[in-house]
Amino acid sequence: MKKHNSLQRTIGMPQAIALYIGAVLGSGVLIVPGLAAEMAGPASLLAWGFMTLLILPLALSMGLLSAKFPNAGGVSHFVTLAFGPKAGALVGWFFLMSVPIGAPVAALTGAGYMTAAMGWGDPARIALAAGMLVIGLLTNWIGMQVAGKVQIAVVIAIVAVLVFSFGAALPGMERAHFTPFAPHGWMSVGQAAAILFWCFIGWEAVSHLSEEFKEPERAAVKGVTIAAIIVGVLYFLSALATVGTQSYLHGGADSSLLWIISQPLGAWGGFIAGLTGLFICTATIIAYAGAASRVAYALSRQGYAPGWMGLLSNRYQTPVGAIGFLALCFTLILSLYGSGALSITTLITFPNATFILTYIGGCAAGIRLLRGSRAGVTISFISFAATLAVFPFTGWAILYPLLITVVFAGVDYLRSGARRVGER
């Protein structure tokens, strides 16, 4: 194994687009349209329209930074350039410690769709989730060229199913289903928009892969723009299908899109819906496992993570030490879930605040680093304001990044003390 060598540039434009889509288009597309419709009725489409417009600055703020400063550290690197190495390393650890929990949650969510559709129990759910995590780790170990190709295939399958679900919904869409337009008042539209925000972040994850882009300037900006448009259209069409058919009333708010998919397919509908959940969550895992392993590698390269996290595979030039760390974390989280010590409801709250803080750090860095571009600063400021407004809603999940900060500060203090003693 090699240590601290450069990563290979193997990610082209199609792979970059697929990785961006996979990072952002999570399992929320199956659940959130129904929840938003239940909350605000047909007026939820206004919230979707607003968030579809906001998606471009959210995406471009990360794309512009990735194009200008391609680095495996991603947001951590941007914050380092803007605010210093310690701030950058702390943000890097926020992201790194989010994925060991977030990826198993995504796997259990995706596996849950399939087991619910097929009537399987919790052991099958855990086994499927473990398989999804293994796929995510293996594809990233073999390399981003392979991971990118796998991601393209998975994303094509996801898009095909979502487009099919919209087509299947068309015959059942009626004008009467759009009235009354705002049955719960206009305030409910704002409340729905707050929930929808979580569906439109994730662009920061792929910034950690920018060092492996063949053409960072092109892949980061053009790739993220294309991906943002695709994601925005898919989310809006899914919401339109949900409202137009009133499936959130027939199939339940949390399974409205699954109800639409199952209607024209009969007995096969549940299986296809479950498979869609698996595909969507596997795409998310591939993107985030790749991002987390790269940020761990970058932190090790800077001396802010153990040296073994910087080990590269001799064969594939991928961060095998960091991938091993993720494998251990995934095993621990699945074991805790399987033993009943932690529920998926508890697990899902932990990474919320750390993901948002990572995004806030990246947007703040963009305001400082993109000063040569008025558009870049404006985009970064809009994204910063939007994410900062949502942060208070993370609630007690703020305790997780607070714990990470305390541990980071303690380790940094001990390292500084040891360095001072050594200098004497």
Describe the residue ranges of each PLM region.
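Hydrophobic transmembrane alpha-helices that form the core helical bundles
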Residues: 35-39, 47, 56-133, 137-141, ...
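TM-loop-TM module centered on a large, flexible mid-protein loop between adjacent transmembrane helices
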Residues: 77-79, 84, 116-120, 225-288, ...
